[in-house]
A protein has these predicted regions:
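A conserved acidic, glycine/proline-rich C-terminal tail/linker
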Residues: 205-237
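Short strand-turn-strand beta-turns centered on an Asx-Gly dipeptide
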Residues: 188-189, 231, 251
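Short, charged beta-turn/beta-strand-edge "cap" motif at the junction between a beta-strand
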Residues: 234-238, 252-255
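Catalytic-core "active-site belt" of small-molecule-metabolizing enzymes
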Residues: 2-203, 241, 245, 255-261
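Carbohydrate-binding surfaces in secreted/extracellular proteins
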Residues: 248
Length: 261
């Protein structure tokens, strides 16, 4: 693995992320040719950045999102501990080309789901959930034209991982079965009031969580106890600028806010 093309690609992408810089594309010798090669590059990021994986994100959990970045389905990526902040935090948009806030249902896992041959069922995944949270994800890509980078490079790019605002925890109860009907009301300081629902995330945030657990399982990785999964945008991505603030009400799951600088 030492000085392999995959490691060189991970180094180039991760260092661009740390520096707030962007690339046109990975050079051909380093460019992944498949989703599997992209995942292999992604798996090397943690060692390059020297940080723990606090949780996992899912990009493109709606048909509109998949069309926007020209991918066939969702893409998973890690969220690193250094970029997780609490409710009410201010997030810098310096170097961020996407400049959107995404209001998402988040699950914290209380029991590790290890790799195994057979897929995890919905009931098994739900039994591993310890907490739910409201969340605001602030993605970005290392690629200047992320819309045309392709799913292999976007997987290598950790599915546009960047900043995560994580709200207070609430214990799961029977209402977790009704998340498709959950209304999420956002408010932006400029007067916009976009609204969405849990059904916008693969039909159900729990379905997205199950997809992520089995995506990791299939690639030989565990969804570890203590990690969170942010499941995708319930509300269409909200364009934000420095000086603005976004608040989101997730009903029984709670409220969250983030300011931007």
């Amino acid at each position: 693995m030492q000085n392999s093309p995959a490691l060189q690609a991970a180094q180039r992408l991760a260092r661009s992320w740390l520096a707030g810089e962007h690339l046109d594309d990975l050079p051909p010798p380093l460019r992944p040719r498949s989703l599997e090669e992209g995942r292999a590059i992604q798996a090397l990021w943690a060692g390059v950045v020297g940080d723990a994986i606090a949780g996992w994100k899912i990009a493109a959990t709606s048909e509109a999102g998949q069309r926007h970045i020209a991918v066939a389905g969702p893409i998973a990526g890690p969220v690193f501990a250094r970029r997780v902040v609490c409710d009410g935090a201010t997030v810098s948009l310096a170097g961020n080309r996407m400049r959107v806030a995404e209001c998402e249902v988040v699950f914290t896992i209380g029991r590790t789901l290890d790799p195994r041959p057979q897929p995890y069922s919905r009931s098994e995944v739900l039994a591993a959930v310890q907490w739910l949270h409201p969340g605001i994800k602030v993605p970005d890509s290392r690629f200047r034209e992320f819309e045309r980078a392709g799913e292999a490079q976007l997987a290598a790019d950790c599915a546009c991982c960047n900043d995560m605002v994580l709200g207070a925890a609430v214990a799961p109860d029977e209402r977790i079965q009704a998340l498709p009907a959950l209304v999420v009301q956002a408010r932006v300081s400029d007067g916009r009031t976009p609204q969405g629902a849990g059904r916008n995330v693969l039909g159900d945030p729990v379905a997205a969580l199950c997809w992520l657990a089995n995506e990791l399982r299939a690639s030989g990785r565990a969804l570890e106890a203590g990690q969170f999964v942010t499941t995708g945008a319930c509300v269409a991505p909200i364009a934000v600028l420095p000086g603005q603030r976004v608040e989101a009400d997730f009903g029984w799951i709670g409220r969250i806010a983030a300011s931007f600088a």
